[in-house]
Amino acid sequence: MAGSEPRGAGSPPPASDWGRLEAAILSGWRTFWYSVAKERATPTASRKEAAEETSALTRLPVDVQLYILSFLSPHDLCQLGSTDHYWNKTIRDPILWRYFLLRDLPSWSSVDWKSLPDLEILKKPISEVTDSTCLDYMEVYKMCCPYTRRALKASRPMYGVVTSFLHSLIIQNEPRFAMFGPGLEELNTSLVLSLMSSEDLCPTAGLPHRQIDGIGSGVNFQLNNQQKFNILILYSTTRKERDRAREEHTSTVNKMFSLQSEGDEQQGSRYSVIPQIQKVCEVVDGFIYVANAEAHRRHEWQDEFSRIMAMTDPAFGSSGRPMLVLSCISQADVKRMPCFYLAHELHLSLLNHPWMVQDTEAETLTGFLNGIEWILEEVESKRAK
């Protein structure tokens, strides 16, 4: 069943935009309503259906009915659609669900490889949306909505949970992740310092026998006092150079990668990882990319994607390893770009392994635990196969 998360604090569209949208919704509803009304003109097969047709709501003028229905939430519309066949058809109006999708997408805090909507379906003109052969926007909304994804996750069969638990008992080493990305270095609030001071995650030094030359053994954390995991934190350059670049709002030379070929406006540069980083890529179970999601920040999206591709190259380890993208801002009062927008700009749909983008705040770690839970589940699922 679909639902919507609370909307952000963004300002509503201008009155003229709302007027056009309302007119489009009412027009779409009216067209659909009259097409269904023709079916209702035929004799009904039962007293129950006859009673439904004479209900108080259906006796109202069409415009009034449409106006009332336009105020229902996605959750309420789905509830209404479950009452009978007539309402099940009526509430599937594509213009209305496209409106819900465009309205709610910017406020959703996560999106993954299974739920990222195609930009083309959001750009369709209204005339194409009302076409009888158009996409089922209601199903697209339900696929993308975090509420629905959580409900599906909660309905996982118990035997799957037990299998994952029993399998985890025989795993000697905790899952290990490589954390990298501009969000580690460019934000005014350090995500790493917040992690290291978190009482919920119980950070401790990694075990010496798992040390990687030139990198270290990482930091061990514990999720909910149960699941342990290790993070190898990878910086692009020295702390002094990072601090200077942050103060001067300039870019540093990323020493984790070596340039293979220069890029252009259509295609970014190609990179490969240096030998020390390659050793990291060979031993980790997944990747955590920290993206700078602050709206005022300029990005080199093609270069970021090229570096992600270099890090996750299956030549340096097993294929299909998951990647968590933390769409990170410093504090809650900083304006952020929506996570679905960031996912498209990073071209994540081109990756051949599971990924999820999770909104995160460096100061409070809001969203971080949700992301870690996801990547740990992906690793356990991969190990169990």
UniProtKB/Swiss-Prot annotation:
Residues 54-100 form the F-box domain. The modification Phosphoserine is found at residues 11, 46. It holds the Pfam family F-box-like. It is found in: Cytoplasm. Transmembrane segments: none annotated. Pathway: Protein modification; protein ubiquitination. Phosphorylation at Ser-11 varies during the cell cycle. It is low in resting cells and high in the S phase and the G2/M phase of the cell cycle. Phosphorylation is decreased during late G1 phase. Phosphorylation at Ser-11 is important for homodimerization and for optimal ubiquitin ligase activity towards CCND1. Homodimer. Part of the SCF (SKP1-CUL1-F-box) E3 ubiquitin-protein ligase complex SCF(FBXO4) formed of CUL1, SKP1, RBX1 and FBXO4. Interacts with TERF1; this interaction is prevented in the presence of GNL3L. Identified in a complex with CRYAB and CCND1. Substrate recognition component of a SCF (SKP1-CUL1-F-box protein) E3 ubiquitin-protein ligase complex that mediates the ubiquitination and subsequent proteasomal degradation of target proteins. Promotes ubiquitination of cyclin-D1 (CCND1) and its subsequent proteasomal degradation. However, it does not act as a major regulator of CCND1 stability during the G1/S transition. Recognizes TERF1 and promotes its ubiquitination together with UBE2D1. Promotes ubiquitination of FXR1 following phosphorylation of FXR1 by GSK3B, leading to FXR1 degradation by the proteasome. This is F-box only protein 4. It comes from Mus musculus. The lineage of its organism: Eukaryota, Metazoa, Chordata, Craniata, Vertebrata.
